[in-house]
């Protein structure tokens, strides 16, 4: 899996059992639950490759997401992954620390 060059984050890794650096995979996960949709940006522990999903949208109606952006999520658009991966407000909302 190719990793994207964005802000590294620090989070407790469930595989390593301690705080580790995580990197952006450039992949999104989209999950439909009835009439609602969840979208996550997937990060990965640099050491053990455990994944961490950062919430982009949670339990929203698909009509609240622009058709173009929704299509880009489904296509794992690298440019969109970089945009979210460098958005400090997005990262803060997901309660992660910024890496060095």
Annotate each PLM feature.
Residues 11-16, 45-48:
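Short cysteine-rich clusters marking metal-coordination/redox-active sites
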Residues 22-24:
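Short, flexible domain-boundary/linker segments around small modular repeats
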Residues 20, 52:
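Cys/His-rich microdomains that often coordinate metals
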Residues 37-41:
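Short beta-strand micro-motifs in enzyme catalytic cores
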Residues 1-10, 26-30, 34, 54-100:
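Short, intrinsically disordered terminal segments enriched in charged and Pro/Gly residues
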């Amino acid at each position: 899996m190719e990793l994207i060059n964005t802000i590294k984050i620090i989070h407790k890794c469930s595989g390593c059992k301690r705080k580790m650096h995580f990197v952006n995979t450039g992949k999104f996960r989209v999950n439909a639950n009835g009439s609602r949709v969840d979208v996550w940006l997937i990060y990965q522990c640099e050491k053990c490759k455990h994944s961490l999903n950062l919430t982009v949208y949670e339990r929203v109606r698909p009509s609240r997401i622009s058709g173009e952006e929704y299509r880009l999520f489904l296509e794992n658009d690298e440019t969109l992954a970089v945009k979210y991966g460098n958005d400090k407000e997005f990262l803060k909302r997901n309660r992660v620390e910024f890496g060095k």
